[in-house]
Amino acid sequence: DIAIMLEWDDQTKSSNFDHSALYIDRAAVMFPVTAEKEAPSITMGEPGKPVNIWQWKAIGGERGQPGVKDNSNIKLAYQTIEDLNAEGYSTLTDQNQQDVKGGAVWKNNKWRLVFTRSLTNSNANDVQFKKSIYSLEILCNFIL
C-alpha cells in the first residue's frame, strides 16, 4: 500500500454543510494515469493525458448530505475522499470504483490528512505505482 500524509496550518475549520460555500477546507493530489516521460499539464491533465486525482473535502459533499445525527465517537465525520479523473480543465469526473481511503483531523489549528490505496489495482483509470516506473524521489517531488 501507499500512504500520503499532508499537513497544513489553518486557523479556521471550514467544514459546514453550506453547499453554496466556495471556500471549504479541501486538498488533493494528482498523478498521471499513464507513465510517460512528459507529465500531463498541472491543470488537471490534458486531452489524451489523463490524471488521477485524490480529493478530500472537510464536508460530506453530495455523498454525505446534512441531517445525519452527530456522533461524538467518530473523528472523521462528514468527510469525503474522492477518486477522480480529468483530461483537462472542466473535465473532472467521479470514478465508479472508489479505491482511495483516508481521512483528516483538525487539531491545534492544523489539518492532518492521510490518503491510502494499494500500490496497484485492476482499475485502468487509476495511477499504478509500479516499482519499475516510480521512485520515491520522483513521487515525493510530484506531490509536493
Description of each model-found segment:
Residues D1-I74, K131-I143:
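Surface-exposed, glycine/proline- and aromatic-rich loop segments on solvent-exposed faces
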Residues L22, T93-Q97, N108, K131:
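A generic structural signal for short, non-catalytic loop/turn and secondary-structure boundary residues
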